[in-house]
Curated annotation (Swiss-Prot):
This is Ion-translocating oxidoreductase complex subunit A. The gene is rnfA. HAMAP family: RsxA_RnfA. The keyword Acetylation does not apply. Part of a membrane-bound complex that couples electron transfer with translocation of ions across the membrane. It is an enzyme of class 7 (translocase). Belongs to the NqrDE/RnfAE family. Its main location: membrane. The complex is composed of six subunits: RnfA, RnfB, RnfC, RnfD, RnfE and RnfG. It is a multi-pass membrane protein.
Length: 193
């Protein structure tokens, strides 16, 4: 049990996919202008990452490895992720049309979010079992969502700040992301990985 807690802490905080591994930067910068959109994107990504980790493990274990088709891993994982994202998009469209409109193009872009594919591939490379794969996917998405919501809150505060003209827009967003990355480096001594 303690191993799973350490896996969650190390994946969500210490080895954060956005701030440490630089995966998932497109939705991180694109959806973080409003906190409501960031929360919605975080929840959608959380669902997709967790389910995609489970599906990728099952496909690897029961399809690719027995057939010795490991060379198709990336292609098959992209297909699995696309199916999970399409399912998520249909569910969000039915349950919350407002959130569906707010997320716009970013929801289908979860398919090409490199963090989702990165988590699926890292699960295989780290030789996680089924439980560890699901926990790793969930904690990676938890870290992604946490960083996304915190960054959206900072960007909303920046709109009210008096920022010099050359730093407005993407410049101050990247500076803020860098400072967030430095803040998350403080977690590096928390757990030895």
């Amino acid at each position: 049990m303690i191993d799973y807690i350490l896996l969650i802490i190390s994946t969500a905080l210490i080895n954060n996919f956005v701030l440490v591994k630089f995966l998932g930067l497109c939705p991180f910068m694109g959806v973080s202008k409003k906190i409501e959109t960031a929360i919605g994107m975080g929840l959608a990504t959380m669902f997709v990452l967790t389910v995609a980790s489970l599906c990728a493990y099952l496909v690897e274990r029961y399809l690719l490895t027995p057939l010795h088709a490991n060379f198709l891993r990336t292609l098959i994982f992209i297909l699995v992720i696309a199916v999970v994202v399409q399912f998520t998009e249909m569910v969000i469209h039915k349950t919350s049309p407002t959130l569906y409109r707010l997320l716009g193009i970013f929801l289908p872009l979860i398919t090409t979010n490199c963090a989702v594919l990165g988590v699926a591939l890292l699960n295989i490379n780290l030789a996680h079992n089924l439980t560890q794969s699901v926990i790793y996917g969930f904690s990676a998405s938890l870290g992604f969502s946490l960083v996304l919501v915190l960054f959206a809150a900072l960007r909303e505060r920046l709109t009210a700040a008096d920022i010099p003209l050359p730093f407005r827009g993407a410049s101050i967003a990247l500076i803020t992301a860098g400072l967030m990355s430095l803040a998350f480096m403080g977690f590096s001594g928390l757990v030895r990985v």
